[in-house]
Amino acid sequence: MAQRNGMSPRPPPLGRGRGAGGPSGVGSSPPSSCVPMGAPSTAGTGASAAATTTPGHGVHRVEPRGPPGAPPSSGNNSNFWHGPERLLLSQIPVERQALTELEYQAMGAVWRAAFLANSTGRAMRKWSQRDAGTLLPLGRPYGFYARVTPRSQMNGVGATDLRQLSPRDAWIVLVATVVHEVDPAADPTLGDKAGHPEGLCAQDGLYLALGAGFRVFVYDLANNTLILAARDADEWFRHGAGEVVRLYRCNRLGVGTPRATLLPQPALRQTLLRAEEATALGRELRRRWAGTTVALQTPGRRLQPMVLLGAWQELAQYEPFASAPHPASLLTAVRRHLNQRLCCGWLALGAVLPARWLGCAAGPATGTAAGTTSPPAASGTETEAAGGDAPCAIAGAVGSAVPVPPQPYGAAGGGAICVPNADAHAVVGADAAAAAAPTVMVGSTAMAGPAASGTVPRAMLVVLLDELGAVFGYCPLDGHVYPLAAELSHFLRAGVLGALALGRESAPAAEAARRLLPELDREQWERPRWDALHLHPRAALWAREPHGQLAFLLRPGRGEAEVLTLATKHPAICANVEDYLQDARRRADAQALGLDLATVVMEAGGQMIHKKTKKPKGKEDESLMKGKHSRYTRPTEPPLTPQASLGRALRRDDEDWKPSRLPGEDSWYDLDETFWVLGSNRKNDVYQRRWKKTVLRCGLEIDRPMPTVPKGCRPQTFTHEGIQLMGGATQEPLDTGLYAPSHVTSAFVPSVYMPPTVPYPDPAARLCRDMRRVTFSNIATHYHYNAQ
């Protein structure tokens, strides 16, 4: 197909070529662009596979029997399972968040038929019936696919209306079942089961749904939860389903599908994944593994260290607790807040640090030399208080052990070893020199590596394990508790991904209260992306129909070559090359659609800033597109929502991030001081407590301790019991609790202490109390006078 200009009035429809995919759907891509270097021309090995050459393409086409579970005549992408696209998409590393241009075009080519049918809900249902059995990749993570399935063949779905979970969408249609590859060697019981053809597992109860504008959802049937995977086709082709935490839960995942946190020490793995003896988990961690650094793997970001805690008070060695006026009181207040939120006993598992501290040697901050102090010994028989200082009893199975992936990982390319020691523990490279080196530990003193001397590592998240086996993360940046995983084995595969994609799970109120789901990010659920320019109302006319939009998205280049050339001349760009690539795509898209990028940015809430004068400029930077160094800085993006801003800060290890404000005066103050006895809490009782507090809160913001103080605010002050004494919302002098009449000087009246006012914990109950005083006659009289 001849190469087309992005400014053509109406590009011709893309030929079906290989149906739902193949290099023919890429439009003007080179013939060999979809075949990776070194990849074989055909993936089929059967003698009956007829190898033919598609006219106009340099791809060696095969005609295999189709994807697993598909009928023999199915077929828009019947060659995907044995085609070059599957080989290309199987090489995406787990640390990478976005797909490359070649992988992007492969995703768009495979999903071409679904995109063209995304006009109405009826058209999507017809497409799912016509292409039933077709296997489509999810991009990220590798090994997950969407098997196109009509709704009538989805077990347990019935007449579920997904618009109740997303009311702003005009229509949402369930079109596929999410399946994933299974390693038969990892689970011999699978074998040739009927439910696992060709090593594919479909027992997770996950379904893929599509909405208007190619909004992609993942529906969790067991939890009745709708997860927003992508807001448009551009985001789906670029990121896939890698941000969906629920995908990483299945314990039948094959080796490296996706790769989990590597715990090569069998003793530590058995300690963390022990289900029947979970009460002794905390004692075992304190006795043997306190201070051990685990290289935590989170999909879509770099490795980061997680230091296993021996006691809750050890958090005083890390920021932001170390710089608090009184760290012990702040930790007590935080522990009290966690007791109120979790409504059961819990265990502080570890502190997650920024990636730059991985491999830095240090000892515990106990006043001695680094690496020479043993962790504090904990008696195996002593009784400890609940709420972070004592192990918790877990009801139910936590999960099976995660198989160790054979491939190495880490910055150096080597594996990792974790050797217990009487002094400290480590995670170091698996080469001979590293194996012979002494073990190290990440602490708060004597830091080595990229950090300056005297600096203290910052705890970005504190991993918690509640009494029911669920894993939560306490974020010291904003003081909230976020769900991370349903069990420990799930956490070792998903890492802290649950805190990086906040506000993307919609569930009924009872389910959200049970799992402590955060509030929905209305910006993501109710508005399109501001940089999805192919959906802009002022875009060119040819980009308003499906064929034109697909040709626009899959056109080659999109300004990335210029950025890569510019990065070779300016090494400073390499640190944030993904941001510059995204800006280059925006500029190229705006030029192809005839839009002014500066106007679009300002309409969305951002502005173009001049590098020298720092004043808004409406002129678009054209020098970057010519390969020259720009005298303008990158266009500032529109202001992010608090949840999106926090997720970006956690993903990029932004240690300077601060919340915008403290909890307001109308926030809900929890007066619950109940002491939860470990091992005596039933699951239904815990869920009932969480639901009751959610009803009492009535959607108000939670009054909570804030370890990270916003700019221009005073630090919060707490008593030894964790009760806040005074707020820090402003720089103005606050009320000290001393009361005196305004017409009498304080010299003649002794000061009288007035305790600070406590907000009423239950606004709904207060309203009911006030309504009891209103009789029917008063209401009738009030209505009569208003009517007059």
Swiss-Prot record:
Keyword terms, alphabetized: Host cytoplasm, Host nucleus, Host-virus interaction, Inhibition of host autophagy by virus, Inhibition of host innate immune response by virus, Inhibition of host interferon signaling pathway by virus, Inhibition of host PKR by virus, Interferon antiviral system evasion, Viral immunoevasion, Virion
Domain notes: The N-terminus binds RNA. The C-terminus is required to bind and antagonize host EIF2AK2/PKR.
Outcome of substituting residue 231 to A: 10% loss of viral replication
Listed Gly residues bias regions: 16-25
Designated name of the protein: Protein HHLF1
Region named Disordered: 1-82, 366-385, 609-663
Function: Inhibits the establishment of the antiviral state and the integrated stress response (ISR) in the infected cell. Prevents the phosphorylation of the host eukaryotic translation initiation factor eIF-2alpha/EIF2S1 and thus the shutoff of viral and cellular protein synthesis by directly interacting with EIF2AK2/PKR. Prevents stress granule formation in response to eIF-2alpha/EIF2S1 phosphorylation, thereby rescuing viral replication and protein synthesis. Also inhibits host autophagy by interacting with host Beclin-1/BECN1.
Effect of residue 126 to A: 25% loss of viral replication
Keyword Plastid: no
Region described as Interaction with host EIF2AK2/PKR: spans on this chain: 671-788
Mutagenesis or variant effect for residue 130 to A: 25% loss of viral replication
Result, substituting residue 242 to A: 90% loss of viral replication. Complete loss of dsRNA binding
RNA-binding: annotated span: 74-248
Cross-referenced InterPro entries: US22-like (IPR003360)
Quaternary structure, from the entry: Interacts with host EIF2AK2/PKR; this interaction retains EIF2AK2 to the host nucleus and prevents its activation. Interaction (via N-terminus) with host BECN1; this interaction inhibits host autophagy. Interacts with the viral DNA polymerase accessory subunit UL44. Interacts with host HSPA5.
A GO MF term: protein serine/threonine kinase inhibitor activity
A Pfam family matched in the record: US22
Consequence of substituting residue 122 to A: 25% loss of viral replication
Residue ranges with Basic and acidic residues bias: 650-659
Listed GO CC annotations: host cell cytoplasm; host cell nucleus; virion component
Localisation per UniProt entry: Virion; Host cytoplasm; Host nucleus
Annotated family: Belongs to the herpesviridae US22 family.
Effect recorded for residue 125 to A: 35% loss of viral replication
